């Protein structure tokens, strides 16, 4: 079929949510002429659910996006109303930053960034069809029958694909927040041969801030100590004029209201068919699943500086509106609260992610990438992390350059993508620190050390960011060398100072670094003996030094494990392998290998249902196959 294209692009991104903006910005910043298409220009980087960025594991993802050259970290640093470091009483591996966002300002600031980006065109249009010829993407067709050519297309449609909002027994076609649903494109993805699933998520009601009795709630302030998501943000710009959140709880009356109305709950009446998120369940689901719990936490989160809307975190529901109102009034502090928006559930189509490569390109169609909730994840941060990887790889494909695959040891983004493409998901996927086997080396404080060089290599990290990183890295390296080179001796003068500071006296000579390994000794304590560094070190560098020194032994063990797995990852599995040709492999393993088509031995070993014996048989088979090919080549050469 011959197509007449109105405009020509290198990359087209469908959807301008959190995945879409990162994909569009990445591709355009790497030099590709890019179209970012959205159903509604007023919903660019919109937050249809919680007004926050970050949190456990997610906050580390935002740092990783920033380290690669992405925008989410910088944008939230410009638009937060509260910043808080979580899990400070725990180890460094699980600490993560969380910010309350000014929801409207976050979206408008990101839209401004997109509008000003060179090589990037932002357009309001409905994409109805992805045009494919000979198994390759060639462009898209809009609802108004305009055709645009492209060498790569990234689908980041969020919950809009055949979206349906559900409140009680009311069910209607809609994307998030009553936007248009994308129905024709959902049909098109099926026609292209992709396996489609059906998931569900939800959002809580919003209440009027002026109708809350705050005296009956617990105030939750932000941090006074400066913290940022972006490695480019400066401590002097930290906002001290923050807005608090408040904590309250459900109670026996709340639970009784829910239990007596379960027959009207879409989740239990059969109206909801999609599979919901395990780690962000609705309040009715929580009451049923955790019937022994007397109460559940609810956080009252402001949606911005210029609105009275309060997001009731923990009260996600699709119960009928009258039940939602009764439920709100049963909660301490909300007895007279006015509901401004009802909570709702939303069902949507998604692409089963086992059909993707680790680049987020579909295996079936060359040049077609998917990212975000389209791939079955939940959360803005998970979406943005996939978006930047899909955008990078779309650009690299167009440019004919080697692809980018982030390993599990590179970052939480790598963990997430590997989980999705290797194990698939049967429910909305959420990142957790427990999913990462190398979490001690995947911390929030070292994201730039892990990923900024990668971002520079692919052409996404600009000169400003690269210079900031180089200064930070050089300061860290130089100070680590200094701590290793200076020795403290157990002489009288030194030990008097050690004891005066509340530490046990030295019995042997040791380096400043070894002294810092004592649990109660800080970097500042070590500096009291050895003097300050040649250059002033910022809080980020000092935090990194303390963590690397105190956990050096554990970090070394983790890096050894990474090296062992690296050898497995380097053993490639040929794309043309015939899985039926391998004798003795278990039936379940054979079925999983056929379904997922692992690209490396490492990936094959992580597929659920595959045991070590299957991997051993596979490795023996591949070695024999390699020898056979070498012999045939040798015969042919003679």
Curated annotation (Swiss-Prot):
GO terms under biological process: tRNA methylation; tRNA wobble uridine modification
Subcellular location: Cytoplasm
Amino acids binding FAD: 15-20, 127, 182, 373
Gene Ontology molecular function terms on file: flavin adenine dinucleotide binding
Keyword Protein biosynthesis found: no
Keywords tagged on the record: Cytoplasm, FAD, Flavoprotein, NAD, tRNA processing
InterPro entries tied to this protein: FAD/NAD-bd_sf, GIDA_C_N, MnmG, MnmG-rel, MnmG-rel_CS, MnmG_C, MnmG_C_subdom, MnmG_C_subdom_sf
Superkingdom as given in the UniProt entry: Bacteria
Binding residues annotated for NAD(+), in chain numbering: 276-290
Gene3D superfamilies, A to Z: FAD/NAD(P)-binding domain, GidA associated domain, C-terminal subdomain, tRNA uridine 5-carboxymethylaminomethyl modification enzyme MnmG/GidA
SUPFAM superfamilies: FAD/NAD(P)-binding domain
Cofactor(s) recorded in Swiss-Prot or TrEMBL: FAD
Major subcellular location class: cytoplasm
GO annotation, cellular component aspect: cytosol
Family: Belongs to the MnmG family.
Protein's job: NAD-binding protein involved in the addition of a carboxymethylaminomethyl (cmnm) group at the wobble position (U34) of certain tRNAs, forming tRNA-cmnm(5)s(2)U34.
Assembly and binders: Homodimer. Heterotetramer of two MnmE and two MnmG subunits.
UniProt name for this protein: tRNA uridine 5-carboxymethylaminomethyl modification enzyme MnmG
Species per Swiss-Prot/TrEMBL record: Streptococcus suis (strain 05ZYH33)
Gene of this entry: mnmG
